[in-house]
Amino acid sequence: MLDDPILDDIGTIRRQFTAHETLDGRIDQAFEAMKQIGFEALIYDYTPVPYDLDGAIMIPSLLKLRNISDDMHDYWFNRGYFRIDPVQQVALRTSAPFFWNYDPNADTLINRFMNDDTAPVTRYLSERDMSTGVTVPVHMPRGDYATVTGIRFGRNKDFERHALRYIADFNLLAHVFHETAYSLFDTRAKSVGTIRLTERERECLRHSAEGYSAKEISRIIDRSVPTVVMHLNAATKKLGARNRTQAVVRATHYRLLEDRPTHNWPPYNL
């Protein structure tokens, strides 16, 4: 563990990540850098849309772990722990990095979200000596977000002081890391849940969202009216909607009607 900040300028940090051509390689690089400032495990997740239509936290499309048991995937995905995790509750409400401690007597930001409903999360982390850490929320321009979390095992009383000393370094590291990681995301990582609309279904729904009838859409895309209706009905069914209007609302909420960019956001030039 170093006594002095270890991070260089943004360009140097970015080059350390982009030297690796795979997502896992860049995650490994982030973990190595995190270990130098005192962290012992890494959690990295990305969620294309923060909330579902009922206001519940969405399960992320990507969850990557380093030095953490793989059973966390099962608990956070299949058992829904991600939805009730107090750390995620805070991450959705702030853009600043924060220290957390699952000890109910600790005065950290997650404390007000800890209750009987979140007890399974507290128990899981406590049983694995993962009760303290720092999380960096990364909120992106279109509403999607990621969190980069560093964990320290055990209950070292000095860890909070140490973590807060290096929290600015970790914040910079996490943001530059996510920028380079995001550029390697595939379609699955950027998609919400299991809903997959074809390009033609998206096109028809997009025109429907603009107020066009099936007959008008048929002229715009140069296809027959029955073909347009078929695509709209297929999209409505995939979205679990009762009618075309609800299908448009759901598709818009889950960002399924957005044009998919063929390029990545330009890097920061700082």
What function would you assign to each model-found segment?
Residues V138-T149:
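Short hydrophobic/glycine-rich mini-motifs in sensory/regulatory modules
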Residues S208-Y212, A251:
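Short helix-to-turn junction characteristic of helix-turn-helix DNA-binding domains
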Residues R200-C204:
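The N-cap/first-turn positions of alpha helices
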Residues F31-H139, F153:
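Regulatory input/activation interfaces that engage signals or partners
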Residues K237-L270:
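Basic, Lys/Arg-enriched C-terminal extension of HTH/homeodomain DNA-binding domains
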Residues L205-A209, T236:
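Hydrophobic residues on short alpha-helical segments
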Residues S213-Q246:
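Recognition helix of helix-turn-helix DNA-binding domains
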Residues M1-Q16, L23, A146, R152-T198:
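Juxtadomain coupling helices with adjacent low-complexity linkers
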